[in-house]
Amino acid sequence: MYENTPVERVRENVLFTPEGRVKAEKIVFACHFPFVNFPGLYFAKMHQERSYVVALENAMEVNGMYIGAEKRDFSFRSYGPYLLLGGEGHRCGDKTGQAARYEKLREKAARWFPESREACCWSAQDCVTADSVPFIGRFSGSRQNWYVATGFQKWGMTTAMTAAMLIRDDICGFTNPNREVFRPGRLPVKDLDFFLSDGVRSVKELAKPFFYDPQKTARDILPGHGGIVTYKGRKIGIYKDEQQNIHGVEIRCPHLGCQLSWNPDEKSWDCPCHGSRFDYEGKLLNGPAQSGL
């Protein structure tokens, strides 16, 4: 086990890291979103969705975990002395209905648990496939010694166990009856519209840096807010902190070049194409990008 050693690229059975090379007969990509674009094309077969959680003290204790059946519903679970209230999910980088997502959760908490107090809050994201079934198995037809586990759609605790058994069985030569269900190379015909809509979205976002001309300047950005502005004839993303210091970044994602959008709830720059995220100073927060801005 090589800890604190990020893999930068992979070629056949060799992993390249900043400190050297590692050879392996079998390689498992269990890294949330596969950072190798070709082969596999996972960036074209998934997107990432982000959701938000507030931890409440002095709220009711619930046994088990609960989630609403509707797309915009909420989830509940107890953890020690806290009740975790989750919801307000959205596609990463989607500006529709953005901002005040934590506030909306706090409003629900005040309505449902008026005696509760907020202890902390956070957000996270996960990969979503076209048919909502994870990709678990061999990475691609041309890389039979590579394996992948991704697209858990926020069901990581159960799906991780499934992935462990499926990949173990394949590596050890055992037959698993569920192998075809999770096969990464599948392409459900009924979900072709998902691929088409995702493809159109990516093309649109890739074209934005060339055709979208922001009308704002740094003076138009209020303290505590961020946005895309024109500076010396080029587009940049800026965040103006409460002391009115300006933090500027390159606005194109280093993964495949999509234009980033500002997430006011997390004060981050998010990629609407494949879900990479960066803090307001450009530091990488989430992949598949492998470097900061």
Where are these regions (language model features)?
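C-terminal catalytic lobe of FAD-dependent flavoproteins
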Residues: 70-71, 80, 93-107, 111-199, ...
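Short, hydrophobic/aromatic-rich segments at coil-to-beta transitions
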Residues: 12-14, 61-64, 222-227, 246, ...
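Flavin-dependent oxidoreductases
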Residues: 6-77, 205, 213-219
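Rieske [2Fe-2S] iron-sulfur-binding domain
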Residues: 54, 227-293
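A glycine-rich dinucleotide-binding beta-alpha-beta segment and adjacent secondary-structure elements
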Residues: 119-127, 145-148, 205-252
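Short glycine-rich, flexible loops that bind phosphorylated cofactors or substrates
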Residues: 36-37, 92, 261
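Short loop/edge segments at beta-strand edges and connector loops
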Residues: 3-5, 11, 120-122
